[in-house]
Amino acid sequence: MSKPSILQQILTAVQDVDTKVDALQAQLTELDGKVQPLDGLSEQLTALDTKVTTIQDILGGAEVPDVPLPDNPLNKTRSRK
């Protein structure tokens, strides 16, 4: 059996590298999809910490702070036609 030419060896090596790069790109794309939902996590954790602190203060006997109530569509008056 004859030894493959140098050009064939280079082509095979390039194809191997290309396959590895494609696999790495797929892993990076998958990782990016998992990381994007974490972008707003810091703000969410800060808001949660504030709420937990407020609850702890209330349970500890502190004065209840004025907290704006969220809009509740069930409490709105409905017009009858």
Curated annotation (Swiss-Prot):
The gene is P10. GO terms for cellular component: viral occlusion body. Seems to be involved in the morphogenesis of the polyhedra. Forms extensive fibrillar structures in both nucleus and cytoplasm. It is involved in the liberation of polyhedra from infected-insect cell. Belongs to the baculoviridae p10 family. The keyword Signal does not apply. Keywords: Late protein, Viral occlusion body. Residues 62-81 are annotated as: Disordered. The keyword Protein biosynthesis does not apply. Pfam families: NPV_P10 (PF05531). It comes from Choristoneura fumiferana nuclear polyhedrosis virus. This is Protein p10.
